[in-house]
């Protein structure tokens, strides 16, 4: 397994990194620290040595990710799914949330975890696996 981390140039001049992982069987994937967005999943094409194909539906570049209002391929939160009428009660306290999909609150609101830059805390490489720990303090 091989890991490559590099800074990504982007029009917003944000400190975004990409993490690219390759194995010996010609599989690879790439994700960004911006929203934990999974950018590519490349698999070998049968009977075509050293050729791969990206099988992930997504944006072609970081600009598409930055401009998107979507959540797919990203870390979502603080909640996953929809909170009806953008409000809830907990321990007899009532909370009103931002209705980013009126009248509901979806996947963390106006600026969810998909729009945050995550910090790479640790990358652990082994012969047959990779572990990447990221964090975001909110």
Locate the predicted segments by residue.
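Surface-exposed acidic/polar loop and edge beta-strand patches at domain peripheries
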Residues: 1-138
């Amino acid at each position: 397994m091989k890991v490559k981390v590099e800074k990504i140039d982007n029009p917003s001049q944000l400190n975004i990194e990409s993490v690219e992982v390759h194995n010996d069987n010609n599989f690879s994937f790439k994700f960004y620290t911006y929203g934990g967005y999974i950018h590519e999943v490349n698999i070998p094409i049968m009977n075509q040595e050293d050729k791969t194909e990206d099988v992930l539906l997504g944006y072609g570049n970081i600009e598409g990710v930055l401009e998107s209002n979507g959540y797919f391929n990203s870390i979502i939160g603080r909640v996953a799914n929809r909170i009806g009428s953008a409000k809830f009660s907990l321990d007899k306290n009532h909370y009103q949330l931002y209705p980013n999909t009126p009248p509901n609150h979806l996947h963390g609101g106006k600026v969810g975890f998909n729009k945050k830059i995550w910090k790479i805390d640790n990358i652990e490489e082994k012969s047959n696996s990779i572990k990447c720990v990221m964090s975001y303090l909110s």
